[in-house]
Amino acid sequence: MSNIQVLASSQLCDKIIARPTTKFHPSIWGDRFLHYNISEQDLVCKQERVEELIQVVKKEILSSNHDQLKLIDNLQRLGLSYHFESEIEKLLEQLSIGTHHQNNNLHDVSLRFRLLRQSGFKVSSSIFEKFKDEKGNFKESLITDVSGLLSLYEASHLSYVGESILDEALAFTTTHLKAIVANSKDHPLSHQISKALETPLRKTIERLHARFYISIYEKDASHNKLLLELAKLDFNVLQCFHKKELSEIMRWWKEHEFVKKFPFARDRMVELYFWILGVYYEPKYSRARKLLTKVIALTSITDDTYDAYGTIDELELLTKAIQRWDINCMDKLEPEYLRTYYKVMLESYEEFEKELKKEELYKLEYAKEEMKRIIRAYFEEARWLNEGYLPRLDEHLRVSYVSCGYVMLIATSYVGMHDIVTHETLDWLSKDPKIISASTLLSRFMDDIGSRKFEQERNHIPSTVDCYMKQYGVSEEEAIKELNKRVVTYWKEINEDFIRPTVVPFPILVRVLNFTKVIDLFYKEGDDQYTRVGKALKESIDALLIDSIPL
């Protein structure tokens, strides 16, 4: 709820300042994640068993003539693929050159298509033409092939712009899968179908799906006991690893007294760690994950300072100081909270420098320049609000493209990723490639649509929805409908940039895709789960960071 807070500040010679404030609900987690209480001895035993099982799987399963499609799919869905990257790559290469044109099994054809395309292999969508009738429609006989429909539905989300056959496949499968759920709730696949209709695999956060699929796989009579044991143990071991990380970050948050020093800002440290966990969960990215979580936490405070608390004069001073990035600027900042913020920002980046090797510092400098850029964008938006100015959509996007923070966060996500990120990577990023622009605009639109209900409760910065309504003279409903259409197109453009050969290594692109998946979870269905933590987000955090899997 918006209100005006009047402050008497000794730092401002007892001036009375009227400032907009927004009431954000406090953290729903309290100190739950502050302490890490897990037996290290028990964890070591589990890790040793995981390593044993990995070797067994490599020797007995991956080296056999097992059903390759099913094996790859299970490894990925169970969250185990990061242990078998080279083995899966070899299997996919074999699948890509094999002769499968005579296969008329809808499930297998769709699965092969999805597995290859999501890994960047070139595979034509024309393979689905054989499932159409003489009128050009998908055959009615396919309606009874439920597993085939579900497989085709998942494959259709890997479409490129202009692939009408996959658009038709999505419409066809969605219609009939919804009917199956509505009319056959006891169907063996009904739970999987409901989950897929809610969030298809292409948009699903990998660890969340692993948690869901392990229970599905266990009920499958044909499941491999070794794979199931490995999946459960590995999930629990990773959960312990992540909880330990989170406790470190929570102590950092607590020791800096962010909640006390910036009471006007959202206290969402757990949600932010979950956000970054969706970007990369693997143990080898621990350094990158912790660094990025701290940066996104600082960014959230910055966003709330510019959007919901600071006066235009204060923000102008802060913006200029950030551009100089010099601790000597701190004395010129008034009131006290600005000095506190500025000191924390500069000291945090100094801490990051100490964690990096000398030859890695150029990555942090690049990320720092992106932080300066986002601050300039925040100030421009604050100026619009202060002047009551509603820009045209194209003018708005020149600023809000930056202010959504996406490019800065992607750049920062690369800082701690060790040698795979090079000068060439950052040069690629600086040229704003299609996958970056598509994912950034997708993020911008979903954020604006999702946070619209809350923003309307206060005097807020103009959104892309507002600008679209003004520029095209349409209703709010029509504007949102059009922006959602663009979101669909952006997903297709993201898919296109995974086609091999890629300009940058695959893990670089995966970070962008994973950021987009998290955005989909936080803002889908026109809701802002970050500002107002809802049931869906809480349950997701419970699943990954609280509830272990019974062995």
Swiss-Prot record:
Mg(2+) 3 binds at residues 447, 451, 455. A motif (DDXXD motif) lies at residues 303-307. The keyword Membrane does not apply. Pathway: Secondary metabolite biosynthesis; terpenoid biosynthesis. CDD domains: Terpene_cyclase_plant_C1. One of its GO terms (molecular function) is terpene synthase activity. Its cofactor is Mg(2+); Mn(2+). Mg(2+) 1 binds at residues 303, 307. Mg(2+) 2 binds at residues 303, 307. Binds 3 Mg(2+) or Mn(2+) ions per subunit. GO terms for biological process: diterpenoid biosynthetic process. It comes from the Eukaryota. SUPFAM superfamilies: Terpenoid cyclases/Protein prenyltransferases (SSF48239), Terpenoid synthases (SSF48576). It holds the Pfam family Terpene_synth. (2E,6E)-farnesyl diphosphate binds at residues 266, 303, 307, 444, 447. It catalyses: (2E,6E)-farnesyl diphosphate = (+)-valencene + diphosphate; (2E)-geranyl diphosphate = (4S)-limonene + diphosphate; (2E)-geranyl diphosphate = beta-myrcene + diphosphate; (2E,6E)-farnesyl diphosphate + H2O = gamma-eudesmol + diphosphate. Its EC number is 4.2.3.73, 4.2.3.16, 4.2.3.-, 4.2.3.15. Belongs to the terpene synthase family. Tpsb subfamily. This is Valencene synthase TPS8FN. It comes from Cannabis sativa (Hemp). The gene is TPS8FN.
